[in-house]
Amino acid sequence: MSCVHNNTSFPVQTEAYLKEVFEKYKELQESKDTSLTARFARALKYYQFLIYTAFSDPKFGIGQGENTRGLLIYHQMGMGKTILSLSLAISLSHIYNPILIAPKSLHSNFQQSLLKLIKLLYPETTDHSKELQKISRRFRFVSLDAYNMGQQIIKAGGSLNGCLLIVDEAHNLFRGIINSANDKTNARQLYNNIMQAKNIRILFLTGTPCSKDPFEMVPCFNMLSGRILLPLHYERFYTAYVNKTTNSPLNADKLLNRLVGMISYAGNQNELNKLFPTELPLIIEKVEMSPEQYRQYLLARDVENAEKHASSGMYEKINAAALCLPGSEQESGSSYYVRSRMISIFASEMLTVKEDEKLSEAVQQLPKEAFTENSSPKIVCMLKNIKTSPGPVLIYSQFVELGLHVVARFLEIEGYQCLQPLKVLEEGHNTILLHKDGKDLMVKNFAEDGPTRTLVLSSKITRFTLITGKILSKERDMIQQLWNSPLNIHGEVIKILLVSKTGAEGLDLKYGRQVHILEPYWDKAREDQVKARIIRIGSHDALPPEEKTVQPFLYIAVANQKMFYSIPEGSQEQKTIDERFHERGLEKSHLNSAFRDLLKRAAIECAFNGESGCLMCQPTNALLFHENFERDLRLPNPCQPLVKAEVKAYSISYEGKQFFYQKNKDVGLGYTFYEYNPIIKAYIEIKPSNPLYIKLIKHVQAGTTA
């Protein structure tokens, strides 16, 4: 019989179940068993194997009856969510049709991870490529960011019925759903298809749930449960579960009850933290804008304020529709202060864009004299910090043309060489990467376990390269391989990598010593995602202990002080857009972090990992929550905290079974009885309402105790 998730007994049953799985894992680790389960036990980390087993075991109950249809895999970035999902896809492919939904740039990541997994599963096989082709044929890939995503899904499987749906970077899907003004967007159509699907299993992979707003939980858990588990309207959700006065969760106990059984969390266990490099405290560089830059910035702010006033009132009386954040109807037309934020990075009077000319081309045409401390104090400050780095450096900006491309020009002027690939060719066992200066970079058998590694490069040149959303996946993979080469341990091949939001997704980088975030964002999870590109399990294993550190930097443009105080009082903008974004991000981060803590407490591994605050109820077999969330809030909490304790009790045998009892004058009839629960492997109290309770009292009073 499978576990029932909407039940007070489920948390303790889960703890006992996972302990059994862990013991099995340890046995299989040492065995010579060649079964698929044993192979996965040897290939996976223990926290992966726990979820692998629970998800695929009907006894645990996923997909059974009214239980959840899947899991939110909330594992810290760099812990192997992709490997876990592929393991389940392989094991369940004879039952469910695996469909992998991810940004197109990440599809090759899945292929690489699949090959890595195959090598772990079948170390005795010499031709892993044949096994890769065999297994790959079972998978269907869909691009999350494609305009025709719906058509791709239909082509992949006809419908989502009978599918194992794996969504990577799932927070992007949740945000896309609540940012949609109607049901015509890709994200909203996928939501509706998932809600209507029958016999579907779901894996949502993300290291940063609730990154924008706690309301992201609504589409996530509604899709996992297959019903309206959480209220669809923003106002009702916030009224029920958010204390706006304290900026913290409200009715947290009732929300936890609804979420239990749908979350897997791994990330802050001590033994896992030891595998990560040390993240040093964030250095915030507040950089004063130059006079000319600040002048252009103020002009841009005037334009943005005028646009804001022109559109004000259009949506004020419109309440957010179902599954919409307030203001989603107008977000497509919002500038998000793009002008002023880009000028906060770079401003030059020499920059003019001709008709039919791309902004990136205009930046390339600028003379050397345009790239000075006056045009970008931020970048000049960043370059000074980069020169102190003993190893590879990662630079992030969400702006490509007036962010990353400008940084690239500064680097070239400083003498760095751009290794941006123009073409990747395959020639037998050799891969040739043609880069910007026209020379060839040859890599022979360039793989982590390859027998030889040969690079034809000048060791006297310091190089940088870029990965944005426009780069081809093959070129992206080659850059990642070059960065991760043992020959690049201190940046000898690629010293600096510039990435955009799209370019950064899915990157798995080693050896990085500094991360530079060129502008703040109101979503602090974005900054965590960037840092996680190089702060990963095992990413610094090849370095000596003193070098296993990563120093993050954040750059915030502040007003030119001389000009600021020359502006009439009352007309001054007290904080720059950078400062406002940073402060808003910290405020939002506090609320989002509090909700992420709730997800950790509701995770199925919480008690197994010995975490504090886990949802653990007395196993009374009562319903954990009422389907109607408003009525549920009015009802008493059925989850009575479970307290484990050793007590002195007398043994009694009744009808061939052993029980224990205490004389307890504080209880109505003077006795407390306990019976053994084989599921949780512990004794639990027998309630006075149980007919057995009276029978045991009579048995004791008759003087037949053992």
Swiss-Prot record:
Xref: Pfam families: Helicase_C, SNF2-rel_dom
| Induction of expression | Expressed in the late phase of the viral replicative cycle.
Checking Gene3D superfamilies in the record gives: P-loop containing nucleotide triphosphate hydrolases, Tandem AAA-ATPase domain
Q: Which residues bind ATP?
A: H75, Q76, M77, G78, M79, G80, K81, T82
Principal localisation: virion
Protein's cellular compartments: Virion
Start and end residues of each Helicase ATP-binding domain: 62-227
Q: Which domain of life is it from?
A: Viruses
Broadest EC class?
hydrolase
Chain positions of motif DEAH box: 168-171
Q: One GO cellular component from the entry?
A: virion component
Q: Which InterPro entries match?
A: Helicase_ATP-bd, Helicase_C-like, P-loop_NTPase, SNF2-like_sf, SNF2_N
What are its E.C. numbers? Answer: 3.6.4.-
Query: What are its GO biological-process terms?
Result: DNA repair; replication fork processing
**Partners and quaternary state?**
Part of the viral DNA-directed RNA polymerase that consists of 8 polII-like subunits (RPB1, RPB2, RPB3, RPB5, RPB6, RPB7, RPB9, RPB10), a capping enzyme and a termination factor.
Similarity comment: Belongs to the DEAD box helicase family. DEAH subfamily.
- Name listed for the protein in its UniProt record: Termination factor NPH-I homolog
Q: From which source organism is this entry?
A: African swine fever virus (isolate Warthog/Namibia/Wart80/1980)
